[in-house]
């Protein structure tokens, strides 16, 4: 039955094309078909083959939320996809006005005239009100969840479920092209290699987003950032360099090059909050600008008329700053109106949304994926905390060798919002730079940190230190102890989705000191990596202008700067070593060495780590 109705709809569309029906009439017809077919489409969506109908035609007939892509229905408000059919709405009426009108209407005409004393009375409830104008196009329909998220900041967690990799990949046709969107914030943690079980990485395009957090200028991102990403994907996954892009959807960096490289039926996949929807908004806006650049006599006449009015009225032209601000506001409004919905809440996109960039290229926004464990992180974080954390830190300001740092000393504990607790071993000292969008705090020891975290009511001055609650369901939030593999020099402690903390040991090395220990909530995933700044920006090389090796105390004054190339000869990342059960109370160095030897077949004693063996214990 549903199939026959859709075929009828397709025939109507063909007749409309033959008879040159006006676009507005065609849109109205589609909307009537959407409302009529919505309940049956929702019940029978799995029975339809994606290859039987054009995706754009099917999207026009089967009602979808224009913001998140879920199939719409108007029968059950408690189920996903519920929406209010577009139509005229009445102005808001105060309760006091309603009561006043009721009593005014009950009066006789003479008493009413005496009360009003010649003034015009309020409109009585029985009179017809003027409906509000339709503010959004008829084909832009959003579900209740998206409307509440955008306009009321309401985020029911049960409606922001995060999909698994297998579910997302099975929803994509086998013939589709893939663009894997990777976030620079936690690079390379947002590369989920489970995707490569379904498709070869050589067949994909890799788009690294959010590079405005790493680079101050697009020219630097295009020079150093793109070079590093191309090196990394070639060395790790054998991806051709032309399939790697360094972009920013927020500020429209390098989107034109990406636009020109896209093929038809390209699906944008990636982890949650990797910037897919924001990037597609930028591409949709770019397509709009290219269409406007085409010759159009009617538009040119309208612009000429506006210019003539400005000249005749002698209006002062806008300043350059005002014009830039005005154009940015117009671009932002267009992206929100015509692109997919973008939100800092993970799991916002719930269905595959098509967007036609040109007559020959259609792209799709796809729901983000994540593992079941790491997705639980958002179950106990407040929406405002999630928004602040995903804002990101400017690496070119806070993450370079010239940036300000804090000092973490022996026995002290560093935390960023309770997302982790990093304890410095005895007789050690570290320079710390926080690249997570939340203030850090240093406690004198682990006991004090746990006391404040789990009893915040006793320390009201520190109530804003934590975003992760210390207790859940009247029980302490469990932490898992992890050991950081031995390293020599600086490293980055990277947290999935959130950013990283730069750690640089200082002072003479004590052979009796143990490895770093970090305590994580079970929902938080972390790794260590080589400092990414040495591959994407100019850093100290440790040599003078003549190529002579310098002592470390002379680096800042005499060292030249350089940008290193990633060769793949050394490991770029390493996972942490969990210490659970009996290992939780054992010597950290022994636990680490035993684990490394079990996995790799050999290990280097922590006290013997040097420049030559600094990656020997990385896993």
UniProtKB/Swiss-Prot annotation:
Transit peptide: 1-55
Gene3D superfamilies in alphabetical order: P-loop containing nucleotide triphosphate hydrolases
Annotated Gene Ontology cellular component terms: mitochondrion
CP-type G domain boundaries: 162-372
Entry keywords, A to Z: Mitochondrion, Transit peptide
Entry GO MF terms: GTP binding
Entry annotated with the keyword Disulfide bond: no
TM stretches of this protein: none
Record has Electron transport as a keyword: no
InterPro entries (alphabetical): G_CP_dom, Mito_lipid_metab_GTPase, P-loop_NTPase
Location of the protein in the cell: Mitochondrion
Coiled-coil annotated residue ranges, if any: none
Family under the similarity heading: Belongs to the TRAFAC class YlqF/YawG GTPase family. GEP3 subfamily.
Function description: May be involved in the mitochondrial lipid metabolism.
Protein name in the entry: Genetic interactor of prohibitins 3, mitochondrial
Biological source species: Clavispora lusitaniae (strain ATCC 42720) (Yeast)
Gene: GEP3
């Amino acid at each position: 039955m549903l199939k026959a109705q859709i075929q009828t709809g397709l025939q109507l569309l063909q007749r409309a094309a033959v008879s040159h029906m006006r676009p507005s009439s065609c849109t109205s017809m589609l909307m009537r078909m959407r409302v009529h077919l919505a309940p049956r489409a929702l019940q029978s969506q799995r029975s339809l083959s994606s290859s039987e109908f054009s995706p754009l035609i099917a999207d026009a007939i089967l009602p979808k939320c224009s913001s998140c892509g879920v199939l719409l229905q108007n029968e059950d408000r408690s189920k996903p996809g519920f929406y209010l059919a577009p139509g005229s709405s009445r102005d808001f009426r105060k309760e006091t006005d309603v009561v006043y009108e009721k009593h005014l209407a009950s009066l006789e005409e003479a008493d009413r005239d005496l009360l009003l004393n010649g003034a015009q009375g309020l409109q009585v409830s029985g009179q017809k009100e003027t409906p509000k104008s339709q503010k959004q196009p008829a084909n832009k329909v959003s579900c209740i969840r998206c409307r509440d998220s955008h306009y009321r900041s309401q985020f029911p967690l049960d409606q922001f479920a995060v999909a698994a990799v297998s579910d997302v990949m099975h929803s994509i046709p086998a013939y589709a092209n893939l663009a894997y969107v990777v976030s620079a914030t936690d690079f390379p943690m947002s590369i989920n290699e489970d995707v490569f079980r379904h498709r070869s990485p050589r067949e994909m395009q890799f788009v690294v987003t959010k590079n405005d957090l790493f680079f101050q200028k697009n020219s630097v991102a295009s020079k150093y950032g793109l070079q590093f990403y191309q090196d990394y994907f070639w060395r790790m996954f054998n991806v051709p360099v032309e399939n790697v892009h360094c972009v920013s959807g927020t500020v429209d960096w390098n989107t034109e090059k990406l636009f020109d490289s896209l093929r038809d039926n390209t699906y944008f996949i990636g982890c949650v909050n990797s910037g897919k929807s924001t990037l597609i908004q930028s591409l949709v806006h770019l397509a709009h600008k290219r269409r406007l650049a085409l010759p159009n006599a009617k538009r040119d006449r309208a612009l000429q008329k506006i210019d003539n009015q400005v000249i005749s009225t002698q209006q002062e032209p806008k300043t350059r700053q005002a014009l830039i601000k005005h154009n940015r506001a117009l671009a932002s409004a267009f992206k929100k109106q015509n692109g997919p919905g973008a939100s800092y809440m993970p799991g916002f996109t719930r269905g595959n949304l098509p967007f036609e960039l040109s007559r020959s290229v259609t792209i799709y926004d796809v729901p983000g994926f994540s593992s079941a464990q790491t997705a639980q992180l958002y179950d106990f974080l407040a929406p405002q905390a999630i928004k602040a954390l995903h804002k990101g830190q400017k690496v070119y300001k806070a993450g370079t060798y010239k940036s300000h740092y804090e000092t973490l000393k022996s026995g002290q504990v560093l935390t960023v919002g309770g997302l982790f607790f990093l304890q410095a071993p005895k007789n050690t000292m570290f320079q710390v730079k926080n690249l997570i969008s939340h203030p850090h705090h240093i406690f004198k020891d682990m006991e004090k940190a746990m006391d404040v975290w789990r009893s915040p009511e006793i320390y009201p001055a520190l109530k804003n230190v934590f975003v992760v609650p210390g207790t859940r369901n009247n029980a302490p939030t469990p932490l898992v102890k992890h050991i950081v593999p031995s390293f020599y020099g600086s490293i980055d402690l990277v947290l999935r989705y959130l950013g990283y903390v730069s750690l640089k040991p200082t002072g003479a090395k004590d052979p009796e000191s143990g490895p770093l220990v970090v305590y994580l909530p079970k929902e938080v995933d972390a790794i260590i990596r080589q400092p990414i700044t040495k591959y994407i920006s100019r850093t100290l090389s440790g040599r003078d202008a003549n190529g002579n090796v310098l002592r470390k105390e002379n680096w800042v004054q005499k060292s030249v700067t350089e940008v290193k190339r990633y060769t793949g000869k050394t490991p770029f990342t390493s996972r942490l070593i969990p210490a659970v059960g009996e290992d939780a109370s054992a010597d950290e160095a022994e636990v680490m060495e035993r684990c490394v030897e079990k996995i790799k077949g050999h290990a280097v004693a922590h006290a013997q780590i040097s420049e030559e063996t600094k990656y020997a214990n990385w896993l």
